[in-house]
Amino acid sequence: MQFCFRILILYISLSIDNNYLVTTLISLKENVFLHIFTLTFLFKAFLLKMAKRSVEELKRSADEEASVKRKEKKSKHEHKKHKKDKPSADKDRISKKDKKKSKKGKSKTKEESIEINAEEGAKIAQPAIGSANASNHNDEEAYDRYIKKHNISFADPKSSENLLPILQFDELDVSAKLREGLKNYKEPTPIQAATWPYLLAGRDVVGIAETGSGKTVAFGIPALQYLNGLSDNKSVPRVLVVSPTRELAIQTYENLNSLIQGTNLKAVVVYGGAPKSEQARAAKNASVIIGTPGRLLDLINDGSIDCSQVGYLVLDEADRMLDTGFEQDIRNIISHTPDPTRNGSRQTVFFSATWPESVRALAATFLKDPVKITIGSDELAASQNITQIVEILDDPRSKERMLDNLLRKHLSSGGKDDKILIFVLYKKEAARVEGTLARKYNVVGIHGDMSQGARLQALNDFKSGKCPVLVATDVAARGLDIPKVQLVINVTFPLTIEDYVHRIGRTGRANTKGTAITFFTPQDKSHAGELVNVLRQAKQDIPEGLFKFGTAVKPKLNAYGSRVVDVPVKAATKIVFD
């Protein structure tokens, strides 16, 4: 029996490699109970050893299987990419075309190269497998479909491969507090999804998208994440946002302020029409400054705002600011920020609804290798979420009767929180229409003759639903994001078709549906051709009565005539009288 016991111990020792313990057991004599206890212990150790080996073998097998799948997926993608490559004949054709261009002696300026990249970007808007956020995405075809569905084009002068859009908020590499601020949003809008990867990577970006597309959150989240990553002084302006109007500046401030709740960051808004001294005091120790060009420049020149450490600069609605004559103010403001071309660390972001020549020139001057991201078209276009209805009125005096009928119908059938926005052309007209409607409806007005406090109060009453009807001039037509505007009524047609698109863009925002009704009279016939084009592009029904005014479209005009002429203007000469 003792011999058998020693043989068993020897067998176990070979399995568990514990020579010291086995030697000790062999030295024991006749203590049978101790032998039995030890044998039980060794048997359990033996079973654990076998189980561990089985687990290791299963894990090794799983790793080998995963490796095979990765190789198959990579091979499949390389085959797909190879099929997408252009044939050599196309390359030769492009090469010959380039040679012809070079013979003509045309030199490309930096401004022109941005536009060329934009055209090329529309052709190469394919997601890059080697991009920074590619590891978070498993279904490449889903991203291809998303890009095609929203007509997203990229133009990156530094790379032909584009970063994949961020389709869900949980893919955002930002702090938990910032992500918490997005809980009221369902999913990123196309401009947010496409620009976030580049902005979070620190690239300069030009974002072109229609009104109501969520551009404020698009530049706001990366701006606040940039601040969270700073370890040094945050009590000086680090983020600067320039807005064209007071209302848009206030709205941007409210949106950003809601995102920084619970943090130690401070944001302020500055604009004309309010006491400058109070705004100067509020700007102290603020890390985020939002303001209009004129008031910002005043406070910078006074020394109340120091922009020498601004690392994130945003020009919101850049085309509107240039249209309204703020170009020189913008250039002066930017000159007070760090220059990235001279080892400065400023990240610059332009957001605009269009891509006119003036915005291109400004971008070429102040942005460093910008990525141009376009949602839809470079040209101004109405959202297809808006149902456009054009009412042809032969007699302009019938406007008030039709307006009364529309309000009665929509206020009785609409939802409790639904709002109606009425646009007119002139300030006196706004006051008259407001006074007429106030006899029957709960209505407020907003126009240029009102004080800033009265305008803000009227806007707040409209936003809160206290007054469901707002009569406004075009001062409220650009950039304002007023929730649940179900109906826009253009009582008077605007001066330009661009203003028309911005007016109706107050409804149908952020993937919601809306309706815009426009009164069109013979006095507006010069806009008939442009209006037909807007309706056709948005796939809307075109009333037959509109064609009687003609469909010709005049050449594009600017504020100074029918041609864009760059006339050099000499500096003013100071006259000194003896």
Curated annotation (Swiss-Prot):
Pfam family, one: Helicase_C
UniProt region (Disordered), positions on chain: 59-117
GO biological process: rRNA processing
Motif (Q motif): 167-193
Record domain Helicase ATP-binding: where: 196-373
Ranges of compositional bias, category Basic and acidic residues: 59-69, 86-95
Superkingdom of the organism of origin: Eukaryota
Position of sequence motif DEAD box: 316-319
Top-rank EC class of the record's enzyme: hydrolase
GO cellular component, one term: nucleolus
Basic residues composition bias: residue spans: 70-85, 96-107
Transmembrane segments: none
Cysteine disulfide links: none
Entry remark concerning the domains of this protein: The Q motif is unique to and characteristic of the DEAD box family of RNA helicases and controls ATP binding and hydrolysis.
Assigned protein family: Belongs to the DEAD box helicase family. DDX5/DBP2 subfamily.
Protein's recorded name: ATP-dependent RNA helicase dbp3
Source lineage: Eukaryota, Fungi, Dikarya, Ascomycota, Taphrinomycotina
